[in-house]
Each structure stands twice: as C-alpha cells, then as structure tokens.
A protein has these predicted regions:
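Metal/cofactor-centered catalytic core regions of large enzymes
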Residues: 1-161
Length: 161
C-alpha cells in the first residue's frame, strides 16, 4: 500500500485509447490524451473531478514469482517483471482508503491495472522507480527486475543452513 505517489504513467483504456495519468500526492489528478477515443479521456477526467477518490492510488505491486502467463490479470500480476497499479479502496490490504471517503458508494472499488508485455504491448516500461529513505531505487527495467529487486528477492529466498 503506497503512502504517496508522484509522476505520470500511461493508461490503456481499451484496445485503441491511451492516456497519461498525472499523479500528485497519491491521487490521479487528470488524464492527458495520447491517442484513441478522446471522449474516454474526457469521461475519466469528469469522473475524477466529480469523485476524486476514484483516482486514489491504492496499490502498487510488482510481480515476484516465476510463472507462465495465464491470461487472468489476478494471477498474472504476480509474475516476475510485471507491475500493477490499483486505484480506489485499499482497506482490504491494510490501507486507509475506505468506502466512506468516496462521494458515491458505487465508486468505492479497487481497480487493478496490469502492465505486462502480453497485456500492454504498446506501453514500453523503461523503468519503475521507488524513493525509499531518500534514495531512488530502480525496481524494474523493460519488464525485467533490476538489480535492487533481484537483491531483495535473493535475500528473501536465502536459506540458512
């Protein structure tokens, strides 16, 4: 569960529409049209303005398991080299984004977005970075774990004898 987030990341709305989501203080503030159906971008921006909590970054996850792709996002988000971002509720993960914070109850959802070569081939993930303790760490490069992530995984898998 992220404490905050800043930056811009691409978002695939459907098979033909891509936008750039702008994030400030852990909230998506707007979507910027890249290509496709401009009406989808406008609709998303209207919904963000009407109920800003739908743009709350509720989860940022990195796959850590060596598994084949299944075609099911809930399983594929766990595959090494993938990234998933979720907006909305995170209380089921121990976070503080609860249904009461949303303007309308119907908006109080948790929506995962998976980034993986087979799922989002038009989005080239150059790097995913994390700032921790004042240090910027590269976690993933081109859908492959970077040294920092590999070191974390190796430490987690180390077996004492």
């Amino acid at each position: 569960v992220p404490e905050s987030a800043e930056g811009v990341f691409p978002f695939k709305y459907d098979e033909s529409t891509i936008g750039l989501l702008h994030v400030e203080d852990g909230m998506i503030t707007k979507s910027q049209f890249v290509y496709g159906d401009y009406a989808e971008i406008e609709d998303h921006n209207r919904r963000l303005k009407d109920d800003p909590m739908i743009g709350a970054i509720g989860e940022l996850g990195f796959g850590t398991q060596v598994l084949p792709f299944s075609g099911r996002d809930i399983q594929d988000e766990k595959i090494l080299g993938t990234i998933h971002v979720a907006t909305g509720r995170d209380d089921h993960l121990g976070g503080k984004i609860t249904p009461e914070l949303f303007k309308e109850h119907k908006n109080a959802s948790h929506d995962d977005v998976l980034y993986a070569p087979h799922k989002t081939p038009e989005i080239r993930l150059q790097q995913a970075r994390m700032i921790r303790g004042g240090q910027t760490e590269i976690l993933i490069e081109h859908y492959k774990p970077a040294k920092y992530m590999v070191d974390l995984l190796e430490a987690e898998l180390a077996v004492e004898v």
